[in-house]
Regions:
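Extreme N-terminal tail/first-helix region
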Residues: 1-11, 134, 141-152, 157-158
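Interdomain/boundary linker segments immediately adjacent to catalytic/signaling cores
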Residues: 1-27
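Histidine-centered active-site/metal-ligand motif
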Residues: 24, 31, 93
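Active-site metal-binding core of divalent-cation-utilizing nuclease and nuclease-like domains
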Residues: 29-78, 86, 116-129, 138-143, ...
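Nucleic-acid nuclease catalytic cores
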Residues: 80, 84-132
Length: 162
């Protein structure tokens, strides 16, 4: 029998997976991604998991803000979690979570697919090459009300790196 490798934040990832299983058992497959995201919010609150939904991470290029990474959830400032709802999970979403990890400096992510008959969960770790590059990104949580205001009035000109 193969030996299971214990990853970073093992207890937390198990609790997140347990929450996802509870949501999937109640709702089953076939819903839109947003339904599962809301279900995870409700279940995570019920289970006492601290999380930020749709947390925005600024991305800079040569000191200029060029965009944001917006993972579905960041649990306890430690685990990035992406929710999907596909019958079969496309491989490109694994790369999305790896990119989030590489650029935030977090050590583990979860890619959870609710769309299949059975819940699909992948624990994801940053690429080894990410350690070569210093993290040059600022973590920024922007409330929903401010995001709407910023979208209505986009920034003009270059912005400095924090």
């Amino acid at each position: 029998m193969g030996k299971r490798i214990i990853g970073p934040h093992e207890d937390l990832t198990r609790r997140i997976i347990a929450a996802a299983l509870a949501v999937h058992n109640r709702l089953g497959p076939g819903h839109k991604e947003e339904v599962y995201q809301h279900g995870m919010e409700v279940q995570s609150l019920h289970d006492g998991l601290a999380f930020a939904a749709q947390k925005m991470f600024e991305v800079f290029d040569n000191g200029v803000l060029v965009g944001y990474y917006i993972p579905d959830f960041v649990y306890e400032e430690e685990v990035i979690t992406e929710i999907k709802a596909f019958a079969a999970l496309p491989q490109r979403y694994l790369g999305q979570v790896i990119t989030y990890l590489n650029h935030t400096g977090l050590k583990v992510g979860l890619l959870i697919n609710f769309g299949a008959r059975r819940l699909q969960v992948r624990r994801v770790f940053p690429s080894r090459q990410a350690a070569k590059y210093p993290v040059q990104y600022t973590w920024l949580f922007i409330p929903d009300w401010l995001r709407v205001e910023r979208a209505a009035h986009p920034p003009s000109g270059p912005r400095g790196c924090a």
